[in-house]
Amino acid sequence: MAESFVRLEHVFYKYEDTEKYAVKDVSISAQKGEWVALVGHNGSGKSTIAKLLNGLLFPEDGLIKIGHFVLSEKNIWEIRRQVGMVFQNPDNQFVGATVQDDVAFGLENHGVPHDTMVERVESALNEVGMQSYALHEPARLSGGQKQRVAIAGVLALQPDVIILDEATSMLDPRGRAEVMETIRIMREQEDITVISITHDLDEVLFADRVIVMNNGEIHSEGTPKEIFEQADAMRAIGLGVPFIIELQEKLVAGGFETGSTVLSEGALLDQLWKLNSNN
């Protein structure tokens, strides 16, 4: 098996104003091109892990490795070149007067030659479907469009890892769907590792693997199907389950046979049709 591209080993971290560990003995790994979702209630440690992965925080104990680099003050900038981060509020990330200026900002800071910069900006905006808005002011965009521009700014830097820190939490359903589809396509085309930090359990269904955090520790880990088959365990720590899982539970409670757990409405309809056809 290939070595993990992202690795946390027995990581501990606590903030200065508290005695309680925000992250306690956490070990996580992710392969190149894998999508890993971290879920948990507020205070579970998931956003602290996002900041640790990008070197915004340093662990009190344990090891964090991205690619060939172990996180330290010496190589923090090597880590940040490999890791792009998209935050909850895209307005906090905008610095340019136009969309293309904003996407170019990070490249300028990295000293990328002008001709290369122009190519990367155009390519990144095309990838997120925002090339026609290149000369627009970011402030005039919708929430979903703003977040796609923020993603383009990260893509232009050609990172190996993208961290989504509650990146869709302020968007309406349409904007959320736009952003998640953009990330899905981007990951397939660029083989980028995606670490999504979220409390949106429908968003978790996009992931290859889910890590459930509770009180700074890993509560459980598995595929989305494996995690949501433990619906009662999720509810016991203050989390819910996606709508599609709730729908199956209600059908079973109403006396309908639904078969094995599925994660999409289309798959559920197919399953119900087959079961009904056999009766």
Swiss-Prot record:
SUPFAM superfamilies in UniProt: P-loop containing nucleoside triphosphate hydrolases (SSF52540)
GO cellular component: ATP-binding cassette (ABC) transporter complex
Primary localization: membrane
EC number: 7.-.-.-
Subcellular location: Cell membrane
Membership in a protein family: Belongs to the ABC transporter superfamily. Energy-coupling factor EcfA family.
Stated name of the protein: Energy-coupling factor transporter ATP-binding protein EcfA1
Protein species of origin: Listeria innocua serovar 6a (strain ATCC BAA-680 / CLIP 11262)
